[in-house]
Amino acid sequence: MTRKQKRLAVIGSGMGFLALAAALTFYALGQQTSYFYMPSDLLSQPAAAQERIRLGGLVQQGSVERGQGTHVSFVVADGQNGVPVVYDGILPDLFREEQGVVIEGRMGPDGVFVADTVLAKHDETYMPREVADRLKKDGLWQEQ
């Protein structure tokens, strides 16, 4: 092998390695992507079966029901529609009715959202941006 051929082989191997690393990175990021829905969006355009999504809105007044252990069910609403949610885990301290939440999980075949992560708003003025934008658009939330 000549010097030029060795150099081309090293450069080609390096580029192949970088392409493989980039492909694996994009594949891993694609697996972690979760699309954001409001309850009305989810009911009008259902997510694909077992697709991981984020659902945002307000916890509907009077909908929180605590079951055995850490099992809890509630409804996330956007003022027009609500989606029933079940969650088995410890809820954030700031979780309560009529407060903004973003939950992650999958839509079950029975129309109940099965959450594996619940995120509650941080303080009195915080609202997740996607939720606030949608509620403002629908005229259901005023920024203070």
From Swiss-Prot:
UniProt entry tagged with the keyword Endoplasmic reticulum: no
Assigned protein family: Belongs to the CcmE/CycJ family.
Name of the gene encoding the protein in the UniProt record: ccmE
Membrane-spanning intervals of the chain: 8-28
Topology within the bilayer: Single-pass type II membrane protein
Location relative to the cell: Cell inner membrane
Organism the protein comes from: Chelativorans sp. (strain BNC1)
Domain of life: Bacteria
Protein name: Cytochrome c-type biogenesis protein CcmE
Residues binding heme: 122, 126
Periplasmic side: 29-144
Organism lineage: Bacteria, Pseudomonadati, Pseudomonadota, Alphaproteobacteria, Hyphomicrobiales
Cytoplasmic side stretches: 1-7
Keywords: Cell inner membrane, Cell membrane, Cytochrome c-type biogenesis, Heme, Iron, Membrane, Metal-binding, Signal-anchor, Transmembrane, Transmembrane helix
Function comment: Heme chaperone required for the biogenesis of c-type cytochromes. Transiently binds heme delivered by CcmC and transfers the heme to apo-cytochromes in a process facilitated by CcmF and CcmH.
GO biological process annotation, one example: cytochrome complex assembly
Any one Gene Ontology molecular-function term assigned to this protein's record: metal ion binding
UniProt GO cellular component terms: plasma membrane
